[in-house]
Each structure stands twice: as structure tokens, then as C-alpha cells.
Regions:
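Conserved nucleotide-sugar phosphate-binding/catalytic loop shared by glycosyltransferases and other
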Residues: 1-33, 37
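A nucleotide-sugar donor-handling region in carbohydrate enzymes
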Residues: 1-3, 97-171
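Donor-nucleotide binding loops and adjacent catalytic segments primarily
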Residues: 6, 143-225
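Leloir-type glycosyltransferase catalytic cores
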Residues: 110, 266-308
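Short N-terminal targeting/anchoring amphipathic segment
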Residues: 40-56
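Short acidic-hydrophobic, aromatic-tinged amphipathic segments that line or gate anion-handling sites
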Residues: 15-18, 106, 125-127, 210-213, ...
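A short, histidine- and acid-enriched strand-loop-helix "catalytic/donor-clamping" loop
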Residues: 74-88
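A donor-sugar binding/catalytic signature common to diverse glycosyltransferases
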Residues: 51-52, 59, 63, 74-77, ...
Length: 308
């Protein structure tokens, strides 16, 4: 559970879902635990439920809110690959959340259009992605750990790697790890381990710098100072653009086509070696961040008008 890495960035919550994460549990088990925990604190409440993104928690809390007759406010609404199996279960989570939500905050024009095609046109707002605000604020504050700053010297050139997607597990991970090993012969690699992928160190070469998950500030520091990124993450596709770093996306689809359209990203599945030079070219098509700016202020302004 990576939530601890974010806890120092936000105020202590009034309610917290307790003991819902367990390694190896099924999606159904997690969903049930979330609903039961939400019942303990929020049943019969009239809170507006704000959910972000497409995680199992976001969808399940949307379902809870619907059953409890609470309004659902969805931030990062309208992202689509149009393939329910990729990513799994995130694509289904966001589709179902959209059809439950009362208010939709979309990051891009593409996401607004995705909702329109599904017949969702009321209370849809194009605001950008809050990740832009988070990135800029954290980088400007410069509150990074001594440990991560010592890991990366001023003239250090490295590639940053993260992998965790459910659809890449088993055979595909091994293929990607073999490619990463090949890349490591000529490039320093910092590989951030993920709790859901415990076997990575069995397959990776000793010369690869394997580190445990870092807090969000340090993660952005590693992104900002990297030479390029190799990942199957969704959020990293946005953070790469904010940092003006290129990213090889180890997937066959993306719900963030703006990263590719702007020249910062490329879908490569497991074919890292053949596409490695993409990270080092300078053909950025559009230097304007497609994910917006001052997003949080826009959202707050709309919420104040909607619920005054």
C-alpha cells in the first residue's frame, strides 16, 4: 500500500478506510472491504464524495455514494482506451464511475469528447489535470530527501524505470525485464520496485539500481532529473510531460493520447530496446502542457458555484 508515501503531503483525514489492503487479495475482496469500511463512517451521511481517477477505491466509493444517495464528483473524468481489458480493471472502473457521477472534471478535450460519445454532456467541465499543480508546487518547494539527492549526483545520467500493471504480469514482465537488462549494459538505470511485483530483483541484472518506493516529492525529483523514463504507469505519462522528459510506455493502449500527440510518449509494449533512441531525440511537437495549468483553482471555483 503506497498511501503512506503521500500522507505527509496532506492534512490528516477525518475518516480513513482501515485495513483494506492485503497482498494477493482479489479485486472482489478489496471492493467488499471498501464498501464495509465506508459504511462504518459514512452510511446515511450527506457528504459529497469526490473521487480521483480510476482506482478500485475510486470506483467503489462512487458505488457507495450512489447507494447512499450522495453526489459523486469525479476528478480526471473521461479517460478512455475503449478496451475494457486494457488496462484492467481501471478502464471499467472509470466507465462505470462516469455513469454514476453527478459532476465531471475532465483533464483534456479528448476526455470531454469521450464522455459526449457515451451520452454524458451535463455538468462536464474541462479543467486540466491536478497533477500539473502538484508537480509544479512540489518541484518549486524543493523539499526532497537527502537520501534521494545523494542517489543522483549533479552530472548523473540515468533512465528511470517503474512497472506494475496487472496486464503486464507473468510473461510480459519477464520480456520487459530482459529488455531492461539489455539497456543497462550502456545506461545507468534506477528501477523503483512496486509492492505488487515482488519478483523483479530475481530477473534484473546486479548493475541496475533497485530502490524501494519513495515518497511523492522524491519521485518527482527522480523524474525531473532523469534522462528518460520507461514505465507502464498512467500518472507517469502526465508527470513526464510536466518534467519535459520522454517516456516509453510499456503498454499496447493508453488513455492519455495527449502525451503521445505532444511528442513526449511512445507506446512500445515490451519492445524497449528497439525504441530506446526515442528517449534521446528532441522532436517535441508541442511545448505547451496539454494537461493545463491552475487546475485546482478552476475546480474549487466550480464547486463553490455548484454547492453554494
Amino acid at each position: 500500500d503506497l498511501i503512506k508515501e503521500f500522507s505527509e503531503l496532506v492534512d490528516k483525514p477525518d475518516f480513513e478506510l482501515q485495513n483494506i489492503m492485503k497482498h494477493g487479495q482479489s479485486i472482489n475482496s478489496l471492493t467488499g472491504k471498501i464498501l464495509l469500511e465506508a459504511d462504518k463512517s459514512l452510511l446515511n451521511s450527506k457528504y459529497k464524495i469526490i473521487v480521483q481517477g480510476d482506482s478500485q477505491t475510486s470506483f467503489t466509493m462512487s458505488l457507495f455514494a450512489f447507494n447512499n444517495e450522495n453526489d459523486v464528483i469525479h476528478i480526471e473524468a473521461g479517460l478512455r482506451t475503449n478496451n475494457l481489458s486494457s488496462p484492467f480493471p481501471e478502464e471499467a472502473n472509470r466507465v462505470m464511475t462516469s455513469h454514476i457521477a453527478n459532476l465531471h472534471f475532465c483533464p483534456t478535450k479528448n476526455s470531454v469528447e469521450n464522455l459526449r460519445r457515451e451520452g454524458i454532456t451535463n455538468n462536464v467541465h474541462l479543467v486540466g489535470n491536478t497533477i500539473v499543480d502538484s508537480f509544479n508546487q512540489i518541484i518549486d518547494n524543493g523539499n526532497f530527501s537527502k537520501k534521494v539527492m545523494e542517489l543522483v549526483s549533479d552530472n548523473d545520467e540515468y533512465l528511470l524505470v517503474t512497472l506494475h500493471r496487472r496486464e503486464n504480469r507473468e510473461l510480459n514482465f519477464v520480456n520487459i525485464w530482459n529488455q531492461i537488462n539489455e539497456v543497462s549494459k550502456d545506461h545507468k538505470i534506477i528501477y523503483i520496485k512496486h509492492p505488487s511485483v515482488p519478483d523483479s530483483e530475481k530477473y534484473l541484472n546486479d548493475n541496475i539500481c533497485l530502490i524501494d518506493p519513495v515518497n511523492y516529492q522524491d519521485m518527482l525529483y527522480l523524474i525531473k532529473n532523469s534522462k528518460g523514463i520507461i514505465s507502464d504507469s498512467g500518472g507517469l505519462q502526465e508527470e513526464a510531460v510536466c518534467a519535459e522528459k520522454k517516456i516509453l510506455i510499456c503498454r499496447d493502449t493508453t488513455e492519455r493520447p495527449e502525451t503521445i500527440e505532444s511528442g513526449f510518449g511512445k507506446l512500445v509494449e515490451a519492445n524497449v530496446v528497439d525504441n530506446l533512441n526515442f528517449l534521446f531525440t528532441k522532436n517535441i511537437n508541442n511545448l505547451e502542457n496539454p494537461y493545463g495549468a491552475n487546475v485546482t483553482k478552476k475546480i474549487i471555483s466550480i464547486l463553490e458555484k455548484e454547492y453554494k
